[in-house]
């Protein structure tokens, strides 16, 4: 009886930290990163699959990403998004606010816009999760990334002030790139084109979101082996807006190893293999 009671307490404690509940309707609100995440290998479906595997029932989600969106354009369409009645809103926006030059949004207005988005979502009854903006190129010293760090800090400050769960993707992304532990060519560790996420990028962002939602880190990491087997958008033979060629992260790692032996990028090595095959077929 005592053992059963202790196991019950343990189960309640482990499940109590998950802020997603049965029947939640999770809205993913953002730009093209969020738009493209609504694919088999995208962070949206990875997150939703993990939550369902963890036993959360009757979950729904709203894919609310629009390519090119900035904080002001999200505000302009927010009522339409909220009409779908999300119970949780996961918001990530900012890279276009910085990278769109004259059409971008300066920091004071960006912060004001984020505050208004949060206020309107909460007024509509949604619980918020904030995500710091993604990097623009994988070079931390790039001028836009220096600027983006200030935008990320604004999001951190708002999250802290309002006690909103925070996914610090900007910080996580910089740390993963600096670790140099991804089997990928420089500049494409987490992205396909230095902005839009490849399989690794989607995987790491999904992990960060799930941990912020309260899932145990070891439990989150248990999903990674299966995720690495999903054919995903890789930085080879592709453009971000036409991901017709997909391979799994596991297969990409094999190609990377062979490319390194031949002192080539993975993309160059794949093109080399295609050329060899064509020459073979012509014989």
What does each of the following model-derived ranges do?
Residues 13-17:
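Boundary at the C-terminal end of the N-terminal hydrophobic targeting segment
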Residues 20, 45-60, 73-242, 261, ...:
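Alpha-helical cap/lid subdomain in secreted, periplasmic
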Residues 24-39, 66-70, 98:
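Catalytic nucleophile-elbow at a beta strand-turn-alpha helix junction centered on a G-D-S/GDSL motif
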Residues 38, 68, 108, 145-146, ...:
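Residue-level marker of alpha-helix boundaries and capping positions
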């Amino acid at each position: 009886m005592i053992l059963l009671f202790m196991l019950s307490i343990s189960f309640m404690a482990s499940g109590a930290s998950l802020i997603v509940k049965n029947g939640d309707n999770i809205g993913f609100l953002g730009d093209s990163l969020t738009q493209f995440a609504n694919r088999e290998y995208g962070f949206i479906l990875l997150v939703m699959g993990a939550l369902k595997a963890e036993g959360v029932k009757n979950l729904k989600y709203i894919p609310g990403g629009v390519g090119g969106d900035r904080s002001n354009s999200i505000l302009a369409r927010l009522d339409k998004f909220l009409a779908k009645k999300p119970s949780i809103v996961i918001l990530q926006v900012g890279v276009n606010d910085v990278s769109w030059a004259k059409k971008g949004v300066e920091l004071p207005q960006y912060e004001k816009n984020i505050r208004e988005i949060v206020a309107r979502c909460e007024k509509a009854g949604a619980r918020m999760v904030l995500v710091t903006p993604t990097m623009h190129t994988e070079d931390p010293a790039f001028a836009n990334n220096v600027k983006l760090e200030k935008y990320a800090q604004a999001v951190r400050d708002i999250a802290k002030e309002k006690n909103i769960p925070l996914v610090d993707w900007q910080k996580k992304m910089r740390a993963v790139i600096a670790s140099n532990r991804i089997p990928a060519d420089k500049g494409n560790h987490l992205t396909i084109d230095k902005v839009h996420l490849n399989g690794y990028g989607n995987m790491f962002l999904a992990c960060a979101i799930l941990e912020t939602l309260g899932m145990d880190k070891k439990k989150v990491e248990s999903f990674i082996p299966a995720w690495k087997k999903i054919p995903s958008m890789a930085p080879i033979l592709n453009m971000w807006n036409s991901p017709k060629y997909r391979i799994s992260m596991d297969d990409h790692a094999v190609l990377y190893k062979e490319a390194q032996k031949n002192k080539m990028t993975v993309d160059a090595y794949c093109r080399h293999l295609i050329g060899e095959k064509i020459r073979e077929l012509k014989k």
